[in-house]
Amino acid sequence: MYRRIENKETDSIKENSKLIMHIVWIFCIGIFTVAPELIKLFINAGYAEASVIVPPICLGIFFQMMYTFFYDIEYYHKKNKQIALFSVITAVINIVLNYVAIHIWGYQAAAYTTIISYMILCVLHYFGMKKVDKTQYYDLKTLISLSAVLIMITIANVVFNNSIWIRYAILLDSGIYILIRYKSLVISLYNNILEKIAERKKQSN
């Protein structure tokens, strides 16, 4: 990563980061789609209501992933004090939000305060990155669009938590989008898997 930054390999960084964004994006959707069934199956049906906090937790993970993109640029430019300052600011905000929200709405509020904290941290690191390096390393349009769609899907999964058909329909649509978006990559991976299987069969014979 840092070698690419040094060499200004912006196209490579941009394409790799977009792929990572999409992988984490579909991973988050997959996790909170199957969460209600997994909780009932492996934990206890009495904890089924806990499944409603899985979508916001996954959304928080997505924003956590995004801020690391901007963090890498800041770290490359040795802006350690700036990085530390942003972490402290976000930690204080998170503590205050938790103190207020948990007392009012209960433990589930912690999942939403975490989202807010990571979103703030993401924004801080983005502007911190732009302050030290004006190079366009990331596709901001993709980042914003994926974030917006994931927020809407998160809300839909919380609202329709008890509707298995709606949840899995959203997952199916999201999966189709990924397959279309990375059709050539999926085909390439599929062909590589077939080649490896064929090689192993030859070796076994």
Predicted regions located by residue number:
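Juxtamembrane "helix-exit" motif on the non-cytosolic side of transmembrane helices
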Residues: 39-42, 155-161
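Membrane-interface helix-loop junctions in multi-pass transport and translocation proteins
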Residues: 51, 78-81, 87-123, 158-172
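Membrane-embedded alpha-helical segments of multi-pass transporters/permeases
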Residues: 28-36, 41, 53, 95, ...
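Specific pore-lining/lateral-gate transmembrane helices of multi-pass inner-membrane transport
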Residues: 1-87
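Alpha-helical transmembrane segments
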Residues: 70-78, 125-140
